[in-house]
Amino acid sequence: MNTGESLSLTVTRTIRADAARLFQAWTDPAQLVAWWGPRPVTCTEAQVDLRVGGRYRTGNRLPDGNILYISGVFEAIEAPRLLIYTWQVEPAVGRPERVTVRFDERDGQTEVSITHERIGDAALRDRHQAGWQGCFDSLAAYLEG
């Protein structure tokens, strides 16, 4: 039962790439299409207006062939260390969720930490948790080859 309180999650992964390369992979539409999504989900399109107040949108092909669109607005950008943006599945209903992505480079590799907040219920939180882990797998495969 949802008592009106929102849930959050944090997932972290160290990837063998510098922070600038990771930030670019996360914000360049051509690169997003190449890696975004937990397999077998694939990204069919990506639009990114990388500025505070700018919008992003991804089209995500699900295993059943349907396209799920996720969009939001950038709230903070500190290249190549931080992105904060809202997150809503279209059509957008209710208060958007919020995603914070931190890139902490050390010794030629980068710890990427995602905090996903304002999640409506535990089942959705668990799906997001699995989705972000899958996105990390796809991102690591894309960058580490």
Features from the language model and the residues they span:
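Hydrophobic ligand-binding cavity/cleft-lining segments
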Residues: M1-T42
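Short, hydrophobic/aromatic-enriched beta-strand segments in well-ordered soluble domains
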Residues: R13, I114-H116
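Generic alpha-helical structural signal
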Residues: R16, S71, Q133-D137
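Tryptophan-centric aromatic hotspots in well-structured domains and transmembrane helices
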Residues: F23-W26, W87, Q129-W132, F136
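Hydrophobic-ligand binding "helix-grip"
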Residues: V33, A46-V52, R57-D107, E117
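A conserved amphipathic terminal alpha-helix motif
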Residues: E117-G145
